[in-house]
Amino acid sequence: MTNPLLTSFSLPPFSAIKPEHVVPAVTKALADCRAAVEGVVAHGAPYSWENLCQPLAEADDVLGRIFSPISHLNSVKNSPELREAYEQTLPLLSEYSTWVGQHEGLYNAYRDLRDGDHYATLNTAQKKAVDNALRDFELSGIGLPKEKQQRYGEIATRLSELGNQYSNNVLDATMGWTKLITDEAELAGMPESALAAAKAQAEAKEQEGYLLTLDIPSYLPVMTYCDNQALREEMYRAYSTRASDQGPNAGKWDNSPVMEEILALRHELAQLLGFENYAHESLATKMAENPQQVLDFLTDLAKRARPQGEKELAQLRAFAKAEFGVEELQPWDIAYYSEKQKQHLYSISDEQLRPYFPENKAVNGLFEVVKRIYGITAKERTDVDVWHPEVRFFELYDENNELRGSFYLDLYAREHKRGGAWMDDCVGQMRKADGTLQKPVAYLTCNFNRPVNGKPALFTHDEVITLFHEFGHGLHHMLTRIETAGVSGISGVPWDAVELPSQFMENWCWEPEALAFISGHYETGEPLPKELLDKMLAAKNYQAALFILRQLEFGLFDFRLHAEFNPQQGAKILETLFEIKKQVAVVPSPTWGRFPHAFSHIFAGGYAAGYYSYLWADVLAADAYSRFEEEGIFNRETGQSFLDNILTRGGSEEPMELFKRFRGREPQLDAMLEHYGIKG
């Protein structure tokens, strides 16, 4: 039987991939990669792009194209068999990457290339790829004595296993709690859309009534609208203690020891490489220059946002007391009374907006925005093999009708699919040795409610923003003009700059001119009425300071956890969290809350000592967008400038240089504060 992963495919043969194909395919690809490395090294100096970088890039590309659908399926269609196969590949991949990173011969080949005459003939992107490779050798311990190199490899392998274990615990804990409600009165206050979804969940399990889960589309409406305080508290407790030693499943999928070990190993790794701690190591590949700069940035922002956050909370407390006689707000009351206050102040709720954002309007509206700014058109293809019938596939064409890239769109929450929204690369753009250009392919994944009762999927405005955000990442990957592996698309882009294109795209969701075609009532097609639009815009910065303070809490917690780690004392995870809450949080939270235990961004994602990137990129995005505000939000020339200077350049140059080329100067904080309505 042929292994579909080992056939030559332009797009992954999803329906044919089975768990038993995974390990053999990855093993074969890794063997080919090793052979490519040995072949290149045996060739000997002098080295050129063609005899060194190109053959390695092609071998790596095959590996990436095999592993990408495996990793993706593990996220969107998890099963015990696939999970086990995926887990078996992690140590193999980690071991390979350490082997390459510590390969003396290969390191010397790259140094020979950089120090030789050929380097001057390379283009900007190629030079950057070579420089990055040399930097990565340093960060893989190339200069260390043998026993330390071996320890580096052990740590790297263990960390990849731990990150995966952490993720599995969060997924299992999230799926491990459900509640069936048979008496509809217990769900008083809940919007029709949430009730329909909960009913559909129950029916899918052949149960009568309403099934609630800890997936965001199920959890949020309960916290926001359900009048039943006891139910809100029960769900809040279950959600905020996932994968921990507390709550309804205490100890069952506990991430405490996993986090402790992850932090200790990261610290040891950083010190092996000569860094003071993991925060220093993390910044070696980022835009920010040193830990102090990051801490100053976060602390300064906290100082500016805190007074306004305190005021916002005081107003909420006063409102809950005056209107509902509530003496003390509990954590599970915040979202509920905030929604009531928002209604009271602006007479608008997310649910009122839902009918105006049916899926086809939101998706086609997004495409229209992209067409107006960049001259890019999306065309759907229905002949592509996908992992679930609901997944769609699109190609992007520019004004010369050239295919620039394509993407899979997977919008709805499902069982066995991890929560959240993300963009990932399926295929990266690169010029092959035979002269052909391989075009980029992306995965865009969200977790929205699917269509029920014959109505189309109806999105909240927040979900529309999420869709635009992920598509911003997608454009960065798909519209790249760089043809060099490793620095095309999102590859090689520093983590604190990678959120710029995504946060930048969100702005159009607030522009009346864009909302005119992003919205349209699912029954009548009429766009968002002016009265609702005005209310929505008025409510835009409702509790903005509280939002920023929450992001600052996450950012400071992550950064200080890594920067202040002391092996003698252990990780001090909860102590650090409580200390930071004292500094920035204004909303009280219970001591039994276990937020870190499901903070996948930093324990199982790429945001370790890097969560500050969201706020950092927010400054860049708001400032970049202010140029559109000055010159016109659909100004094609401004769009072209953003495309030429930022989106198409991938990781081929330093982000600050690219930003300055677009903006004509360094970024300034004012636009972001103004954007959130914060009087700094």
Swiss-Prot record:
Keyword Zinc on entry: yes
Co-factor remark: Binds 1 zinc ion.
Enzyme class, broadest EC rank: hydrolase
Superkingdom to which the source organism belongs: Bacteria
Protein name: Oligopeptidase A
NCBIfam families: PRK10911.1
GO biological process: peptide metabolic process; proteolysis
Cofactor dependency: Zn(2+)
Function, in words: May play a specific role in the degradation of signal peptides after they are released from precursor forms of secreted proteins. Can cleave N-acetyl-L-Ala(4).
Binding site for Zn(2+): H469, H473, H476
Alphabetized GO MF terms: metal ion binding; metalloendopeptidase activity
EC number: 3.4.24.70
InterPro entries for this protein: M3A_DCP (IPR034005), MetalloPept_cat_dom_sf (IPR024079), Neurolysin/TOP_dom2 (IPR024077), Neurolysin/TOP_N (IPR024080), OpdA_N (IPR045666), Pept_M3A_M3B (IPR045090), Pept_M3A_M3B_dom (IPR001567)
Annotated source species: Salmonella typhimurium (strain LT2 / SGSC1412 / ATCC 700720)
Matches recorded under Pfam families: Peptidase_M3, TOP_N
Reaction catalyzed: Hydrolysis of oligopeptides, with broad specificity. Gly or Ala commonly occur as P1 or P1' residues, but more distant residues are also important, as is shown by the fact that Z-Gly-Pro-Gly-|-Gly-Pro-Ala is cleaved, but not Z-(Gly)(5)
Keyword Metal-binding: yes
Active site: E470
Protein family according to the UniProt entry: Belongs to the peptidase M3 family.
Keywords: Hydrolase, Metal-binding, Metalloprotease, Protease, Zinc
